Amino acid sequence: RDRSVSRGLGDVYKRQGEQENGTNDQDGSRFSVDFDALRQINPDVVAWIRFDEPAVINYPVVQGSDNSEYLSKTFKGYDNTVGTIFVNAYNHADFNDRNTIIYGHYMYNGTMFNELEQYHEKSFWEKYPSFYIYTPDGNVATYQIYSVGVVKDTSEGYTYQFADDAAFASFLEATKASSLYDTGVEVGNDSQIVTLSTCTREGNDDRTIVHGVRVNVQPAGE
């Protein structure tokens, strides 16, 4: 089911991006999200994703009733192929699954998840090795990127349910093996992963896939 979503993200052309505002100090160190206000706009909001500035990725994250709803619906509910950043509908919304998948369009104007393409270069990862997920419980989780790959939309990296520890270990090994470079970041059976997925310029079946491991959780704004 999630693989059909990644296929659906393939046929995207240049559109204007949309972003709802969180608030932050200039360096991003005291970024905060008003989820009550966001829910008044869209009750499907479950998180906010942010990369270190000057990154463009700084968006609300929703979860629809299925994995097609937000392919062409903006956060404010308008029909537009820019869509919205969204969590796999079959994950739990609290980011406590072993692997939670977040999808976003590759917009040719540089918005949404276009910027993930820059992680194809290890030098970019060295500058910006982490991203942040803010949740309605008032916390922010830091994820350290351990793998960046260009994969097919049927890749094992899209697995989000695991029968046992061995299946999860196989997933971790597969994601490390598919990485374009060695990050040296360690993962194990107690890890919790967030996978970011977007399209590429290479072809309709290819995806840029970025895997991050949760390394810290703390109250947002501290």
Where are these regions (language model features)?
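Primarily extracytoplasmic ectodomains and periplasmic/lumenal surface modules that are beta-strand-rich
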Residues: 44-45, 54-60, 66-69, 109
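N-terminal low-complexity, Pro/Thr/Ser-rich intrinsically disordered segments
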Residues: 11-44
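Surface-exposed beta-strand/loop segments enriched in Pro/Gly
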Residues: 102-106, 117, 144-147, 152-195
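Short Gly/aromatic-enriched secondary-structure transition segments
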Residues: 59-76, 161, 213-215
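Extracytoplasmic
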Residues: 43-46, 54-56, 80-82, 95-99, ...
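Extracellular/periplasmic metallocenter environments
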Residues: 130, 177-222
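Mid-length scaffold segments of soluble, non-membrane domains
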Residues: 76-158
